[in-house]
């Protein structure tokens, strides 16, 4: 009988979100640095302390923010991308000045925090009230929602994130079945785990014959030989291959339903009180989409970091395309995709409470933004 991809108790112990202390213990145990909200993005000196006064009209709004009122702070968190935000399409808006412009038009300025420990770190920041807006994967976002963190999906930063299984050349893994008897790194609570869950179930692998290591430090573990393979994003797989760490065994291009999304998630109490912020963020996403339609290089440059150069992002886009960088997906696709994630996690015992994705996703912010920009 096929085993579930990860045991219910193990997963829940790893990503319990009852409090920051529990999350910190988890992060220490897996060898990651604590994901307290860190310094602002060093690649973008946005001056993220104190207040900012806007003296020129910004964005498409005629709000009083443009008349010199003091801006309120809006804190964004995302996984750390080599010292930058992992913002996907929203990173284009940030680098082009569009996001700051739209936020200022409704009386806000952004503070941008790259957070260590990927999705679980972002969840901890949300749970602690350290950020109002999170940009991260659907898998950890679903875990947070199921565990009682009150969030609303207000946008999509990337609707198609390709994944891969990467292996060391010396590990003797030449086929999918060769993974049995090996050691595989899987970052629990991340989108990479969602792909791994689907992959193991779809390929009918016997998990009793695979040792799972919960870590985000894939490069080090592959280099030292402490793991034989890792479930990673396709961009990481291409980068690791360029670094001579091994090769990609299989990727998700033949299973688009196994890919994941990068969501824009807001604290529900905050966004209900300040709906104009959700609209402003979606205006920024729509404008950023137009930028890359006219100049695709803007996408590669905005997402590049010290670990992932523009050429690497371009290589991934050549495989996956750029259709995922479409904020309209929050209307047409996201609820359906998220329901698949919720159902898989619940059926595999990875979350204890199921819920309806349609009640979680609020596309009204996008719809209003699109109408305003017509």
Regions found by a protein language model. Give the residues of each.
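C-terminal motif of bacterial Sec signal peptides marking the signal peptidase cleavage site
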Residues: 25-29
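Bacterial lipoprotein signal-peptidase II cleavage site
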Residues: 30-54
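Extracytoplasmic "Venus flytrap"
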Residues: 59, 68, 73-95, 189
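Secondary-structure end/capping motifs
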Residues: 80-84, 273-352
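Short helices/loops that flank or line small-molecule/ion binding pockets
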Residues: 119-132, 146-148, 177-180, 202, ...
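Pocket-lining segment of extracytoplasmic ligand-binding domains
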Residues: 139, 211, 217-305
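Flexible hinge/capping segments at coil-to-helix
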Residues: 168-183, 273-276
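Conserved C-terminal helix/tail region of periplasmic/extracytoplasmic solute-binding proteins
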Residues: 343-374
């Amino acid at each position: 009988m096929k085993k579930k991809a990860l045991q219910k108790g193990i997963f829940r112990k790893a990503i319990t979100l009852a409090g920051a202390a529990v999350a910190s213990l988890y992060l220490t145990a897996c060898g990651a640095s604590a994901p307290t909200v860190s310094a602002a993005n060093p690649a973008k000196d946005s001056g993220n302390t104190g207040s900012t006064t806007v003296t020129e009209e910004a964005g498409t709004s005629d709000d009083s923010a443009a008349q010199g009122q003091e801006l309120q702070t809006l804190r964004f968190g995302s996984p750390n991308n080599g010292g930058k935000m992992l913002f996907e399409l929203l990173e284009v808006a940030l680098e082009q000045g569009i996001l700051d412009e739209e936020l200022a038009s409704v009386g806000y300025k952004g503070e941008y925090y790259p957070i260590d420990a990927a999705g679980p770190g972002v969840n901890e920041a949300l749970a602690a009230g350290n950020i109002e807006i999170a940009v991260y994967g659907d898998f950890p976002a679903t875990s947070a929602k199921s565990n009682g963190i009150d969030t609303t999906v207000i946008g999509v930063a990337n609707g198609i994130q390709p994944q891969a299984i990467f292996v060391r050349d010396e590990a003797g893994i030449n086929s999918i079945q060769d993974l049995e008897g090996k050691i595989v790194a899987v970052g629990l609570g991340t989108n990479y785990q969602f792909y791994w869950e689907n992959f193991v179930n779809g390929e009918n692998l016997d998990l009793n014959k695979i040792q799972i290591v919960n870590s985000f430090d894939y490069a080090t573990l592959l280099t030292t030989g402490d793991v034989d393979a890792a479930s990673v994003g396709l961009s990481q797989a291409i980068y690791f291959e360029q670094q001579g760490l091994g090769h990609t065994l299989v990727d998700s291009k033949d299973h688009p339903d196994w890919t994941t999304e990068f969501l824009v998630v807001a604290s529900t109490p905050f966004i209900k009180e300040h709906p104009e912020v959700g609209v402003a963020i979606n205006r920024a996403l729509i404008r950023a989409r137009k930028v890359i339609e006219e100049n695709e290089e803007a996408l590669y440059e905005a997402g590049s970091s010290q670990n992932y150069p523009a050429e690497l992002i371009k290589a991934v886009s050549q495989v996956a395309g750029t259709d995922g960088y479409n904020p309209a997906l929050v209307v047409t696709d996201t609820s359906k995709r998220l329901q698949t994630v919720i159902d898989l996690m619940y059926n595999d015992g990875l979350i204890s409470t199921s819920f309806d994705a349609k009640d979680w996703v609020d596309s009204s912010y996008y719809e209003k933004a699109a109408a305003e920009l017509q």
